[in-house]
Every structure is written in structure tokens, then in C-alpha cells.
Swiss-Prot record:
Alphabetical list of InterPro entries matching this protein: Herpesvirus_CEP3
Protein name: Cytoplasmic envelopment protein 3
Membership in a protein family: Belongs to the herpesviridae cytoplasmic envelopment protein 3 family.
The entry's keywords: Host cell membrane, Host Golgi apparatus, Host membrane, Lipoprotein, Membrane, Myristate, Palmitate, Phosphoprotein, Virion, Virion tegument
Subunit structure: Interacts with cytoplasmic envelopment protein 2; this interaction is essential for the proper localization of each protein to the assembly complex and thus for the production of infectious virus.
Residue positions bearing lipid (N-myristoyl glycine): G2
Disulfide bridge positions per record: none
Subcellular localization: Virion tegument; Virion membrane; Host cell membrane; Host Golgi apparatus membrane
One of the GO biological process terms: viral budding from Golgi membrane
One Gene Ontology term, aspect cellular component: host cell plasma membrane
Membrane topology: Lipid-anchor
Provenance organism: Human herpesvirus 8 type P (isolate GK18) (HHV-8)
Length: 61
């Protein structure tokens, strides 16, 4: 059972093919979700964007 646990145990730090530890903060930028990025993705999409209708918030008496 100990052998199986030693195989399944993940390393505490990600490593590359050679076994050297990777510095994730320096090597890879974090994925940022912004309105500008989302608009660019929507404009490049092959599907037409669905337009949302704004509801009138004023109460009709």
C-alpha cells in the first residue's frame, strides 16, 4: 500500500522534463479575465452575439 501511495503522491512543486523545479510565477503569466478580453473573444467568434434587451426599470402606474 505504501508503494501505491508513493506513486500517486504529487510533487510539492511542479517540475519540468529534466526534473528541475519550475518557478510558475516567473515562467507563466496568470490568466486575466477582463471585459476587453471577453469582448475580443466575442467579436472573433463565428457565432453571432445575442443582443440583450434592457428592461425598463420605471414602474408604470
Amino acid at each position: 500500500m505504501g508503494f501505491l501511495l508513493s506513486i500517486c503522491k504529487r510533487p510539492s512543486q511542479p517540475v519540468d522534463v529534466d526534473g528541475e523545479p519550475l518557478d510558475v510565477v516567473v515562467d507563466y503569466d496568470p490568466i486575466r479575465v477582463s471585459e476587453k478580453g471577453m469582448l475580443l473573444e466575442q467579436s472573433q467568434s463565428p457565432y453571432p452575439a445575442l443582443k440583450k434587451k434592457k428592461k425598463n426599470k420605471e414602474a408604470i402606474y
